[in-house]
């Protein structure tokens, strides 16, 4: 069977400027007290913005806007309605793999006729009580994805992975990606960072183990061929149609995959 090159959907977000930069510059010769007040007011507004919003989980997308980082896990939550259109019944039993999986599981469980589970690859000691309740109920597991996943083959209709693979070396990708495909019956959706996107700072390296590696679409396509994966045509086309209609504007690379038969 001829192998199809896997396409990706992406859109690089427009840059923005810090809203208080002009004010601080114009007041540079004012009294030190006024300058300090402006800085404090700006900081309070940003912190309030980052932690506001509906839902029991803080939005990592909003936090990323403040810190300058970008999270593909936040993208997953934005893309859920479009993924449901693309996969239909394939969204019955979903496994999400990646950092902050509790927030994704929470969003998925709000969808009708959708069951959801998550694998958190990193420590969750700082997680809130709602996330820890997911762990106690078995909806979320903390597991090192460098090793086999604790699930039987085709346990889930769809597996969605975000952010986690960007921190793995090719050595471990060769083991982890086939594992993701093994536990999925209808396919795997990979949300990967774009080259040039900012990710983990030095302070976070102790958690992730290594800096994020933002790989190009061509790199991923070669890798998929090597690991016997191909584009999942039908849902990929539906997803692209939704993007072309403006229903969703991805800021990460999105790959729709299935095993090569």
Curated annotation (Swiss-Prot):
Disulfide cross-links: none
Methyltransferase keyword on record: yes
Deletion consequences: Plants lacking both CGR2 and CGR3 (cgr2-1 cgr3-1) exhibit severe defects in plant growth and development (e.g. shorter hypocotyl and primary root length due to reduced cell elongation, and abnormal pollen tube elongation), as well as reduced levels of pectin methylesterification associated with decreased microsomal pectin methyltransferase activity. The double mutant cgr2-1 cgr3-1 also lacks uronic acids and methyl ester.
Segments on the Lumenal side according to the record's topology features: 57-261
Topology of the protein relative to the lipid bilayer: Single-pass membrane protein
GO MF, one annotated term: methyltransferase activity
Residues of this chain annotated as glycosylated in UniProt: 174
Entry's family note: Belongs to the class I-like SAM-binding methyltransferase superfamily.
Protein name (record): Probable pectin methylesterase CGR2
Species of the source: Arabidopsis thaliana (Mouse-ear cress)
Designated gene of the protein: CGR2
């Amino acid at each position: 069977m001829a192998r199809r090159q896997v396409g990706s959907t992406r859109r690089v977000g427009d840059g923005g400027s810090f809203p208080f930069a002009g004010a601080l510059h114009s007041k540079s010769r004012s009294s030190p007290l006024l300058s300090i007040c402006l800085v404090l007011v700006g900081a309070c507004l940003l912190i309030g913005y980052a932690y506001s919003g509906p839902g029991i989980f803080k939005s990592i997308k909003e936090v990323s806007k403040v810190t300058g980082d970008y999270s593909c896990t936040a993208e997953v939550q934005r893309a859920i309605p479009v993924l449901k259109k693309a996969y239909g019944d394939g969204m019955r039993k979903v496994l999400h793999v990646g950092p902050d999986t509790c927030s994704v599981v929470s969003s998925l469980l709000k969808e009708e006729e959708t069951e959801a589970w998550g694998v958190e690859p990193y420590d969750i000691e700082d997680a809130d009580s709602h996330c820890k309740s997911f762990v106690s109920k078995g909806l979320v597991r903390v597991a090192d994805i460098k090793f086999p996943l604790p699930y039987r083959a085709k346990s889930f209709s769809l597996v969605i992975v975000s952010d986690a693979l960007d921190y793995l070396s090719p050595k471990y990708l060769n083991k982890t990606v086939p594992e993701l495909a093994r536990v999925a019956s209808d396919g795997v959706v990979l949300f990967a960072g774009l080259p040039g996107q900012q990710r983990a700072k030095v302070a976070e390296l102790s958690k992730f183990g290594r800096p994020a590696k933002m790989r190009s679409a061509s790199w991923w396509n070669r890798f998929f061929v090597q690991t016997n994966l191909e584009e999942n045509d039908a849902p990929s086309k539906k997803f692209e149609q939704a993007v072309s209609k403006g229903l969703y504007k991805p800021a990460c690379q999105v790959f729709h995959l299935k095993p090569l038969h």
